[in-house]
Amino acid sequence: MELLLVEKPTLRYLIGPQQQPVLQKLSDISLIIEYSLGESCENLVLYPENLTPGFFDLSSREAGEILTKLRQYGIHAAIIVDLTTYPHSQYFAEMAYEENKRGFCYFCATVAEAEAWFARHDAAKR
């Protein structure tokens, strides 16, 4: 699994490599979950290239299945993508907006935004 563990004084997360696939197929999400749990890390940062080919096409149902699995195991995922420029299906941006409100997945443009989201979430748990 090509995920890097980032450890900061008050924050830990796993991050996928830029411009490299991590999830080749839908079932690979189980490997990410296993790796996250093995590292005792509930925060995950992924880039579009890390996701399955159909993730940004809602008709594939891949986004829903992946996010549901992560949610079931208590893993918070930040997806680093600019939805104003990255190609996606017609209603994907609406789904991303709703996911951002739920608190388990956050679509944002930078890793710094993801770190801030993780920090807010971790602070709310204390």
Task: Give the role of each language-model region.
Residues 2-126:
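Amphipathic, Lys/Arg-enriched alpha-helical "gate/interface" segment within cytosolic domains
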